[in-house]
Amino acid sequence: MKHYIHILLTCLVTTSVAAQPKFSRQHELIDGPKSITVSITGDASATIRYTTDGSTPTRTSKKYTSPLQFRETTILRAVEEIGDSLSPVATASYIFVSSVLSQSNNPAGYPSTWGQYTQIWGTAKADYEMDPEMTGNSTLRSKITEGLKQLPVLSLVSDRDNFFSHENDEDRGGIYIFTGPPVGDPTGHGWTRPASVELFGGPQQHDLSVSCGVRLHGGHGRLAEKNPKHSFRLVFKEKYGPKTLKYPLFGDASTGKYDQLVLRCHFGNAWQHWDGDNRQRAQYARDVWARRMQRKMGHTAVDALYVHLFINGMYWGLYNIAERVDEVFGKDHLGGKEKDIDVIKIEEDGGNSLEASEGTLDAWNEMMATAGKVGSAATDAAYAQLDTLLDIDNFIDYMLINQYGGNTDWNHHNWYAVRRHNTTADGPSQGFRFLCWDTEIIFEDVHVNVASGAVSSDKHGYVSQLFHSLLRNDDFARRYVRRAGQLLSADGLLGESSVVAVWDSLYHTIDKALYAEAARWGDYRRDVHQWQSRGSLYTVDDFYQPERRRLLTKYFPYRSSIVLDQIEDYVGISVAAGCHDLMADTRRRGEGTAAAGLYFNLSGQPTTRPTRGVYIKNGKKIIVR
């Protein structure tokens, strides 16, 4: 009998599962000292082990015995220990504003250099500090403090070596040291490390804590000489934590389920960029504007959430969280199952090769081959067949967003196309939809002409190839020009009022947070790495605001009519001709008249009192300024 009792007790002990400990206060942005209690949530006999430097607790970590007192930024991580069993790690980030303001360039245990340069000789100097010229200025210090509180905090926590180890090892090397760029030495590409992610605060009062994998993301932004502030990708897999993140990240309109998220650093037109002219144009809203505008037009679009990123408690700057375009994105936005989704993109592996990151290239190749056969007749069979392979309305609007923006870093890369290829309960199979992505190099020269869908090296890109094939068809050409007239009119979605409304909504989301970004990275090209040309101390008042004024006074008021003229010249069809059928339909419905002196807007509606914009009068285009 005693033998059986011993076996039973042994089984009970060895099968006990340690539970995550609980903190008396969760993650938060803090102004003053805090006392934190850690409590056992499982077996009362458990021991709590904890660390305060971001490292993973082990059996040899400190034993918790009494409340912890914090007066500076602390990453608290704790486990419950029962025998040989350790619970999953609980993590809470306590970010002190005073610690951010005094963030130095020599944090204990962190390296003084980062990765090797790729296209020039040398090694990147590490840069951790907040610029003391800004934080030491009482006026700017107050604005930085206010800016830190404007957005949610995204705290990314992992063992220090997972980010910054110089050991060239696939399992132990630091992902911020071995960045895996698309040119040169690819060491580090795809390396993924376990991490804890917390999202908290901000206007939405976010409250998320989850374990996941973290890896670097991007193309040339991985090159240390070009960009010291890298983008990341969060990967949700069972080996790191939950298989899928279920959280309303982007609000009620969001699907709320993700297996990957991208933390976009704002590489193009940003203060840390390697190119001096690029830095002058920093606005931190161009790419998000394109995505928001695509959604405003009623199309599938990639959402965004601005955040302040912290790495192991150190402020890393202004980022935006974006959905990763993959099979989960496709399923949630287009319907069907994950296996029904094709995602096509350009992989920046040095050769900018086309790939199906999900699904196959079969439908894409069929679409491109069919487009190559398109003829001019309205009844052209190839053009009719494209309706099942391409969402033409989406494609036209996608082209017009990029043409309006004057995108000069596009076509040969920086785009996604996604489709559902099976008939499901959500409907029949769909044509490819193009998504705005990495649209950072826009709103530069108000006169730049990308009406052809291409600039310089982009002229042979897949997007422009498809566009040129479609323009051979008269029906598509008129449809495209007519839509251009509608969107680019004064009251259109790409008219000044609509464009500025989206632009200003983004500005007012980050206007205070920009002061924190400036303090973190505004001095980099002056004080740390002066590649090609010595930079300035980039500040909101001296650099950001002048560029904002330029856009509001010299770009947005004129760009719509300029692009419309460029499109008419390139296609060889006037807006008046493109809108002729639309106006004829209006007259047939008895909604208008062709009487002399009557103006038609580009949606075909008549008016006797036109405001600024483009109109049709007596069959001719009229610009009212």
Give the predicted meaning of each segment.
Residues 568-603:
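Residue-level detector of functionally pivotal "anchor" positions at catalytic/ligand-binding pockets or at interdomain
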Residues 614-625:
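C-terminal tail/sorting-segment detector
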Residues 2-10:
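Sec-dependent signal peptide recognition
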Residues 103-157, 161-176, 185-187, 196, ...:
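Middle-to-C-terminal accessory/interaction subdomains
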Residues 72, 611-615:
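A glycine-anchored, Pro-Gly-centered beta-turn/N-cap motif
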Residues 172-354:
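Conserved ATP-binding subdomain of kinase catalytic cores across diverse folds
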Residues 9-18:
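Hydrophobic h-region of N-terminal signal peptides that target proteins for export
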Residues 18-186, 192-194, 199-202, 207-213, ...:
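Short, compositionally stereotyped local motifs that mark structural "simplifiers"
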